[in-house]
Amino acid sequence: MFNKDMYALGSKRSSIRELFEYGKKCANEVGAENVFDFSLGNPNVPAPDCVKDALVELANSCETLHGYTSAQGDVAVREAVAKNISRRFGVDVGKDLIYMTCGAAASLCITLRALNENNSEFVVLAPYFPEYKVFIEAAGGKAVVADYDEKDFTPDLSTLEQAIGKNTAAVIVNSPNNPSGVVYSKDTIEKIADVLTRKSKEFGHPIFIIADEPYRELAYDVEVPYIMNFYGDTIVCYSYSKSLSLPGERIGYIAVSPKADDAKNLYLAICGAGRALGYVCAPSTYQKVIEKCVDALPNLNAYRQNRDLLFNSLTKIGYDCVRPDGAFYLFVKALEDDANAFADKAKQLGLLLVPGDDFGAKGYVRIAYCVSYDMIKRSVPAFEKLFEQYESNKR
């Protein structure tokens, strides 16, 4: 006997991972140079030098490098993370409100489990990372989707209001956004905070913001508002996977706002959820790396150049694209209503694009441009050919 829901998840992979595996298979069959794999948000920019330096130093000097830390993370590491938040954003979180985790996915799963009570509802703002629904349901909650404004892919506040009810525990806010690359402005965050403040009073309990921030440092010439400064009942789920190009190392943290309702006990609930899920003692080596590299920032030049090349090339051809101010994704309007059919036609030209249906945005495809500049240049003729095929069918 086994759990049928888990079987369903295991037997049908996420559309992103499935496309990624398909790309590897195609590369083996026809040559990697003939496959333009834009499926997975896997950073192509190397980790900063400080990461390598820290690893060498730790390997030569730290006798407990591979040992256990405290369940919630090494004290010195949590102190370093807390001080970084205080320096950068002016929020005095303190080490006792920091929980080190195995990346943003673990942070989300722990937080959702900590907040869920009697089939709580969690609002996700479209477009959204598809695994949100998986994580919410695994925590015992129910996902409720709030729509987006089609003009700029920011949250539609009227549908957000309608989505919030008496059982709402939290709203997940992801900015810079995956898949659109949109960065929510200060004005947008203030409006979301206003809605949640009113709804919290209406229903007599706090409605939290879960700030999913793996792309916080990947913003081009715009400011990413720090949500704790706008809304007290905020829990930040952070990952170093994108900012330090460490996706395979699985390291991040949860930070509870000191202004959150019953913050200390909320943190204890997070500790309890981490224990129940087996997410204790995040990878100790990379905890210590983070302590030494906590102030490091990514080199955005490569991503900015990729964005500009891809956005300018596709819009010149005639594609309708959402200009991204952050992350490393370009959201492109499919050339037919059925984005899955469009992505299938793109496949025939070696272009691997993720349909937007799973992101809650039908009629779009996501392009992950965290690839080599050369690959983007070589892919442009394929995008041109794809566009020409649709244009010729109109004649």
Identify the residue ranges that each predicted region occupies:
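Glycine-rich loop-to-alpha-helix module at the N-terminal edge of alpha/beta enzyme cores
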Residues: 38, 64-65, 80-83
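PLP-dependent class I/II
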Residues: 1-19, 26-59, 76, 86-395
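Short beta-strand to alpha-helix junction loop
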Residues: 70-73, 77
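A ubiquitous short alpha-helical element
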Residues: 65-68, 274
